[in-house]
């Protein structure tokens, strides 16, 4: 179900938590979900990004495009079972060898998600679970709903699509109010930015390693 909340004027929660969750609002929003998921890593972190997903999921929704990460190597790990996916995520997070570990995982229990959060803290990295919905219990500190928005107007041709846009809803959080933000992909910098700031000169990026607002994509 799409959010009825207006776009928030509050700052976007840029810096990722050790463990987050995000789901697509509708099946057609899976590409937007993956774009958002891959963005939850700090700018300047050159460690690889790992994606663990069932083979059936990859066959249905496609494989992430590694060069779109803007320099970070992509490790794609097809799995068969939820247990296998959770094991891969936990080992990757605990190792500290990756900047981000994303798992298309359904049905993770509260205990399993707590193990992932603990592993992420141990490894100094970020984990993101991408279930079908947010109905279950989870240790994730932020839980998001992602939907696709009409693209921006192309600056050189109003008949052509411009930069991809997505709406992100913070549905649940520890210590933060729910909110909705519009983000936009910058294809030149491989970054997601707040869409309403792109017209400004020198807009801040979302999720920087130095703690300033910024978010890698």
Q: Where in the sequence are the language-model features?
A:
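N-terminal regions of ATP-driven nucleic-acid and macromolecular assemblies
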Residues: 1-100, 105-217
């Amino acid at each position: 179900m799409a959010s009825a909340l207006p776009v928030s004027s509050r700052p976007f929660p840029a810096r990722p938590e050790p463990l987050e969750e995000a789901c697509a609002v509708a099946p057609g929003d899976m590409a937007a979900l993956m774009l958002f998921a891959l963005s939850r890593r700090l700018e300047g972190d050159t460690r690889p990004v790992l994606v663990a997903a069932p083979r059936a999921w990859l066959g249905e929704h496609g494989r992430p495009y590694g060069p779109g990460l803007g320099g970070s190597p992509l490790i794609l790990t097809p799995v068969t079972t939820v247990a296998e996916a959770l094991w891969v995520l936990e080992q990757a997070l605990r190792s500290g060898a990756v900047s981000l570990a994303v798992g298309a995982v359904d049905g993770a229990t509260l205990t399993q998600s707590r193990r992932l959060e603990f592993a992420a803290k141990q490894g100094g990295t970020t984990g993101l679970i991408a279930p079908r919905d947010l109905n279950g219990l989870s240790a994730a500190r932020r839980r998001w709903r992602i939907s696709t928005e009409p693209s921006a107007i192309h600056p050189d041709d109003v008949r052509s699509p411009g930069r991809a846009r997505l709406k992100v809803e913070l549905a649940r959080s520890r210590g933060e109010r729910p909110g909705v933000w519009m983000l936009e992909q910058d294809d030149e910098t491989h970054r997601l930015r707040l869409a309403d700031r792109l017209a400004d000169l020198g807009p801040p990026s979302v999720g920087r390693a130095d703690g300033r607002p910024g978010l890698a994509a």
